[in-house]
C-alpha cells in the first residue's frame, strides 16, 4: 500500500519534472503525444505556459506544511481528476492517436490516485496545534 507521504512526494516530483519539460523542452512532450513538431509547433506555447504552474504546484506539495499543505493536497485531487476527464474525452474523440490517448488517460489516472492517497492521508494528520493547545 502506498503511504500518503510517499504519494504526495511522488506526485510533487512528477509535477516538477513534467513542468520543467513543458518549460524547457515542449517539443519532446508534443512528440510523446504523436505531434510532428516539424509540421506543427503550436502546442509549445501552452506547454510552456502551464509548465511554470505545474512546477509551482509541485513545489507546494514538497514545501508547504499544515493547513496550507492540506489545501494543496485537496486542490491536487481536483486538478488531476479534471486532467483525467480531459484525457478520457480527448482519447474518446480521437483527438490524439489511440496509443497516446490511452497513455494520457493512464498517466492522468495514476496522478489522480496519488493525489487522492496524499489527500486522504493528510485528512488523518493531526496538527501540532491540535496536540498541544495554544493558550493566548
Map each language-model feature to its residues.
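Short amphipathic, positively biased membrane-proximal segments
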Residues: 1-136
Amino acid at each position: 500500500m502506498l503511504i500518503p507521504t510517499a504519494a504526495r512526494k511522488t506526485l510533487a516530483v512528477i509535477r516538477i519534472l513534467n513542468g520543467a519539460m513543458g518549460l524547457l523542452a515542449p517539443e519532446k512532450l508534443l512528440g510523446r503525444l504523436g505531434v510532428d513538431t516539424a509540421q506543427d509547433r503550436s502546442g509549445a506555447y501552452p506547454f510552456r505556459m502551464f509548465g511554470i504552474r505545474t512546477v509551482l504546484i509541485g513545489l507546494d506539495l514538497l514545501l508547504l506544511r499544515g493547513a496550507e499543505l492540506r489545501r494543496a493536497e485537496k486542490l491536487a485531487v481536483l486538478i488531476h481528476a479534471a486532467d483525467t476527464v480531459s484525457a478520457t474525452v480527448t482519447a474518446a474523440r480521437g483527438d490524439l492517436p489511440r496509443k497516446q490517448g490511452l497513455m494520457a488517460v493512464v498517466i492522468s489516472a495514476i496522478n489522480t490516485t496519488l493525489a487522492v492517497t496524499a489527500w486522504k492521508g493528510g485528512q488523518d494528520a493531526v496538527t501540532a496545534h491540535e496536540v498541544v493547545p495554544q493558550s493566548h
